[in-house]
């Protein structure tokens, strides 16, 4: 029987660099994760591509997906919906492949309830002032929205106790290395490895 894949969930406050870290991880040739693309109702940022960075939907389309139980998790964050398509995630895990989710904190907590065996990593900013600077530098939010995001960020940072690991994103390359090391260690845990060896001993 094929070993079930590992669900890797990366989340953290807006502006912490989740997308940048995810892109850096998937640009490396030795990356073996499958990326689960999220669905959102927010407008695309400059350079974002539909079906690559997100599936961009209208609110009506998103709410229909909720009604049809097509989302593993979903949340409304600063006026926009975000969610994860459930079918792709479950099938990929059954195929023995690791699935990488980059989602908002609210969504991650929902996934934790559905997949307690998953690996949950909180990406943290070096400081709140640096986090605000990153959001401002994006140039995509109004002053009011920036303040809303900062309030949300403070609340989200307080939720990091719900995660297995915390990685500070002070340097993208270093953060990527830490995340990949965490995933490797998780695959080598006794709970995942021992059953395979015990079965091998039974055969011999």
Curated annotation (Swiss-Prot):
It catalyses: GMP + ATP = GDP + ADP. It is an enzyme of class 2 (transferase). Essential for recycling GMP and indirectly, cGMP. Residues 5-184 form the Guanylate kinase-like domain. GO terms for cellular component: cytosol. Its EC number is 2.7.4.8. HAMAP family: Guanylate_kinase. This is Guanylate kinase. The keyword Ribosomal protein does not apply. GO terms for molecular function: ATP binding; guanylate kinase activity. The lineage of its organism: Bacteria, Bacillati, Bacillota, Bacilli, Bacillales. Belongs to the guanylate kinase family. CDD domains: GMPK. ATP binds at residues 12-19. It is found in: Cytoplasm. Its main location: cytoplasm. Keywords: ATP-binding, Cytoplasm, Kinase, Nucleotide-binding, Transferase.
